[in-house]
Amino acid sequence: MRAVVLASGGLDSTLLARLASDEGYEVFPLFVDYGQLAAQTELSHCIAAMDKNGIREPVVADIKGFGELVPSGLTNSDLHVVDQAFTPGRNSLFLLSAASYAATIEAQTIMIGLLDERFHLFPDQTKDYLEKAEKFLSLAVGQTISVKAPLMAFSKQEVIAMSKAKDIGQTYSCHVGSEIPCGVCIACKEFNIGGE
């Protein structure tokens, strides 16, 4: 049973990959470089996190041009990392990349590390979005694709607690890309609030 897990080197996706592996999935991590400012820092942490958890090294989808086509605070340092964080189509890009990869390795399941939708900030972080995406992705790749987001049952605090219990190791969650997290971006704030 194979699953493509979208992996960023962050807490949520690392825990997701570990849980999938523990459930018996053969995990194929996929790191998407969409031109985000944090790409290199995220990738190095992603490689280390997968290794720490006994999971194969991630395959990299190099789609850097997306960040130039769709600039946001995550892809352009001239834009505000919080106020202009929404990157239209980002999760759709991730899911289409994962579904296409899944089709080439005979996997029917893809996983994304979205959390409890009560706290979603963007329109592509809801169950409704995922249900509609699943239909589109199955049509797009010519096979049934199951989109799973098991962490949607949990808050950030619960994900942090589960990660500690699983001892998943060091992860990286910062949109700026500096080695020391900025403490200002949405990812940092979410982590800090969840850790309180």
Task: Kindly give the residue locations of the regions a language model identified.
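ATP-dependent adenylation/nucleotidyltransferase module used to activate substrates
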Residues: 1-166
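A polyampholytic, Gly/Pro-enriched intrinsically disordered region
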Residues: 79-82, 166-172, 192-196
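Local cysteine-cluster metal-coordination motifs and their immediate loop/turn environment
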Residues: 96, 170-193
